[in-house]
């Protein structure tokens, strides 16, 4: 007889949206700061004199362009995590209403996060870095839609399996 912790899954959708927003903002700012730093280093003649230095700085720039794909990977990881925890955490169908209310609150909060993303990326400092993040920009602008879809997938997975009294399934 295996017992799992019965917490989780309801708030996971909201936490995923908040963490995704945090990662997106952090990566965008990191890209902006590091790109400006590398450009400044490349224009300084005492730093960019050797070929290995130029290659190393080019490697930093190449790594920064991969941060966009990392946000997509984080989104996929959160989706898979919510599906897995929804399957492993048993839920009585009577609690579906509470889960639905939490999804609605998560969509409202994710709308605020999407609007905050749009406002933050409209600043002159971050606009140049935004062109390197097309996937992240799409995900963040459509975050309420993603949260809705992920939330309903969580409902189907958590409450769609047969319920057996006593917590055993």
Where are these regions (language model features)?
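Long, compositionally biased, intrinsically disordered regions
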Residues: 15-169
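Glycine-centered recognition micro-motifs in short, flexible terminal segments and loops
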Residues: 1-19
């Amino acid at each position: 007889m295996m017992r799992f912790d019965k917490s989780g899954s309801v708030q996971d959708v909201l936490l995923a949206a908040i963490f995704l927003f945090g990662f997106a903002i952090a990566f965008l700012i990191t890209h902006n700061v590091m790109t400006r730093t590398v450009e400044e280093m490349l224009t300084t003649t005492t730093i960019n004199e050797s070929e290995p230095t130029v290659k190393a700085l080019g490697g930093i720039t190449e790594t920064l362009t991969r941060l966009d794909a990392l946000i997509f990977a984080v989104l996929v990881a959160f989706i898979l995590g919510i599906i897995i925890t929804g399957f492993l955490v048993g839920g009585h169908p009577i609690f579906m209403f509470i889960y639905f209310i939490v999804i609605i609150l998560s969509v409202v909060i994710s709308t605020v996060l999407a609007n905050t993303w749009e406002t933050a990326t409209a600043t002159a400092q971050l606009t140049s870095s935004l062109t390197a993040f097309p996937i992240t920009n799409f995900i963040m602008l459509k975050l309420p839609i993603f949260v809705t879809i992920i939330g309903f997938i969580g409902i189907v997975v958590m409450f769609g399996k047969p319920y057996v009294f006593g917590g055993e399934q």
